[in-house]
Amino acid sequence: MNVILLDKIANLGNLGDQVVVKAGYARNYLLPQGKAVVANESNVKVFEARRAELEAKLAAELAAANQRAEKITALEAVVIASKAGDEGKLFGSVGNRDIADAVTAAGVELAKSEVRLPLGALRTTGDFEVEVQLHTEVKAVVKVSIVAEA
């Protein structure tokens, strides 16, 4: 299926690119999320008329993400207290939601879907650097310190 992208999508293309994707990916993800439109003559004309508006919106989102990244980088270590055993092993784990809630409590809005833990949840006490992806082009690192509850 041939579609016109309305947003930058990783491993696919930028705003305004006409790309060929599998029909299921287009119908189930790109079209319902508003990230693309079917590339027919009328949609191409409508897109060209709205191109400047969409580029301005994309630039505003990028600027907002950069501001949030600066705030996150400026944060000192976010402390999360969790129950732990004698050797520093946690009873349970610290996951995306816990980190997002702690950063939000520290004053910077963060959604759990923006937290990246490629090795899974954190299961020991200590200091960690967690990557946060705020936009397709903007990443930041949050310092997380997990301490045992008294």
From Swiss-Prot:
GO terms for biological process: translation. Signal peptide: none annotated. The keyword GTP-binding does not apply. One of its GO terms (molecular function) is rRNA binding. Keywords: Ribonucleoprotein, Ribosomal protein, RNA-binding, rRNA-binding. InterPro entries: Ribosomal_bL9, Ribosomal_bL9/RNase_H1_N, Ribosomal_bL9_bac/chp, Ribosomal_bL9_C, Ribosomal_bL9_C_sf, Ribosomal_bL9_N, Ribosomal_bL9_N_sf. One of its GO terms (cellular component) is ribosome. The keyword Membrane does not apply. Binds to the 23S rRNA. Belongs to the bacterial ribosomal protein bL9 family. NCBIfam families: L9. This is Large ribosomal subunit protein bL9. It comes from Shewanella sp. (strain W3-18-1). The gene is rplI.
